[in-house]
Regions:
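Conserved catalytic breakage-reunion loop centered on the nucleophilic residue
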Residues: 1-286, 296, 307-332
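Non-catalytic DNA-recognition/assembly elements of restriction-modification systems
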Residues: 289
Length: 332
């Protein structure tokens, strides 16, 4: 190509680019004008729980809505997102694309999507580059518009608000204790990342102890074994059987003294923090006609326990999600 051809090509490319930018800006202006008017435009292909009617309005997909409600309820029962995702896949529940593929991000996206409570926040993302069409998260660069009661809700606003508070509580818990997750396989090991040392404050780890007559599970302070010639934490090792027994004792003590706790819960029902009121109602329901626990109930641990502290001489302090504290001594 000679110099004249190259010049012509450059001019035409520039014109095409200007045209592309002009079209992009016009489209964005039109969309933002609709946003200002509160007109909601949502692609339901990747939006779980809703379909669209002939007029483009969001309508509930009954089968998907059942799954959404179950996800919200499970989360407030103390089930972590990875467990929720695994159970949905095990049951073969179709995701938004029709296949049983669920991830932690998918679950968290459903829990944090305000559209499930009937509202819509417009312009969460925007096109940063008209050439690449790359979408970026709107973190204050452009105005956002909150449309309330735009469509029928799948979950109540009260439940949605409580879930957001619980999400933040778990984030704060992990940050405060230096954790990356709330624990894996917590549906089988509910004490994971919930047991702390009452001497040095470190996390207790679950370990296998080998003896002549076999092996047993036990919990010990993470800072106990620091290496040769380095003195670790002096706290005792706790057999898992004793930890389970201690929780059963603590829970049964709550049931036995329910009337005393009831005054505490009733007062919390009017708390300005919706999560506090939710927990009070939850504990009242769990203990209403409950029979004494004979062996560890994993679901009760997941629903009720915030954390526990292990201290020397078999002392264990249990801290529950309603703010209650029960201390006891294990062993003979």
């Amino acid at each position: 190509m000679d110099s004249t051809g190259e010049l012509l090509f450059t001019i035409l490319s520039s014109l095409a680019q200007d045209e592309s930018r002009s079209i992009s800006e016009n489209c964005q202006w039109g969309i933002r004008s609709l946003f200002k008017q509160g007109v909601v435009h949502i692609n339901t292909n990747r939006f779980y729980g809703y379909d669209k009617d002939e007029d483009g309005r969001l309508v509930i997909n009954p089968e998907q809505a059942k799954v959404v409600r179950w996800i919200f309820e499970s989360y407030m029962d103390g089930i972590n997102p990875d467990i929720i995702a695994r159970r949905l896949m095990e049951q073969g529940v179709p995701g938004c694309m029709g296949e049983p593929k669920w991830t932690v991000d998918t679950i968290m996206g459903i829990l944090q999507n305000e559209k499930h409570m009937g509202d819509a926040i417009l312009q969460k993302t925007f096109t940063a580059d008209y050439l690449t069409k790359k979408q970026v998260k709107n973190e204050g660069q452009l105005a956002q518009y909150h449309v309330k009661d735009d469509h029928e809700a799948i979950v109540s606003k009260e439940l949605w608000d409580v879930v957001q508070l619980e999400i933040q509580r778990r984030k704060d818990y992990m940050k405060r204790n230096g954790l990356r997750t709330m624990g894996r396989n917590t549906d089988e090991q509910p004490f994971t990342n919930r047991v702390f040392c009452g001497v040095c404050g470190q996390l207790f780890w679950r370990r296998t102890l080998y003896r002549l007559n076999g092996s047993i599970k036990a919990w010990m302070c993470a800072s106990r074994c620091k290496g040769k010639k380095v003195k670790g934490c002096i706290n005792d090792t706790l057999l898992e059987a004793d930890l389970h027994k201690a929780f059963v004792m603590a829970w049964n003590a709550m049931l036995e003294n329910r009337e005393d706790f009831l005054e505490h819960w009733k007062a919390q029902l009017n708390d300005q923090n919706p999560l506090v009121a939710f927990r009070a109602k939850q504990f009242m329901k769990l203990t209403e006609k409950a029979k004494p626990m004979k062996e560890l109930d994993v679901t009760i641990v997941s629903k009720t326990l915030d954390h526990c502290e292990i201290k020397p001489l078999g002392v264990i302090d249990f801290y529950f999600l309603d703010g209650s504290h029960i201390g006891l001594v294990t062993g003979d």
